[in-house]
């Protein structure tokens, strides 16, 4: 099901922080409900960049163990990932879970993947993994 985010709501969401949005949802639902939240420290790689707002484009990554599949399967899966991420019809954010957490070693977000995803029109990325060479 496709959802649309009108400009007025988009602008409003950009103007508030995440705790404000969570509190508003709890008020609307009439109960406290967000028990599945980050307990660690979040680090913003571009603090002057403003709020990221958009629909989540999700994926999972891993790097601790080498892949065991045939190279053609790996290539097809990667191409499907990039096709999926490139299908942006509105505001979107990449949300990538590193399943190796807390022992992440695959710095997926570096200069190249950052530029590729920006080229797709994504507003930014959220990950529990590692980043490098973003400059």
Question: Where does each model-flagged region fall?
Answer:
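Histidine/lysine/aspartate-rich catalytic loop segments that bind and position anionic ligands
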Residues: 132-135
């Amino acid at each position: 099901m496709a959802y649309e985010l009108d400009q007025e709501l988009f602008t409003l969401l950009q103007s508030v922080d995440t705790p404000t949005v969570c509190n508003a949802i709890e008020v609307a639902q009439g109960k406290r409900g967000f028990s599945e939240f980050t307990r660690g420290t979040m680090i913003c790689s571009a603090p002057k960049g403003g709020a990221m707002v958009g629909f989540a484009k999700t994926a999972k990554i891993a790097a601790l163990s080498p892949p065991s599949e045939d190279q053609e399967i790996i290539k097809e899966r990667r191409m499907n990932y990039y096709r999926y991420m490139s299908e942006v019809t509105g505001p979107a954010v990449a949300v990538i879970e590193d399943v190796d957490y807390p022992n992440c070693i695959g710095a997926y977000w570096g200069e190249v993947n950052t530029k590729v995803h920006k080229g797709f029109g994504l507003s930014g990325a959220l990950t529990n993994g590692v980043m490098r060479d973003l400059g």
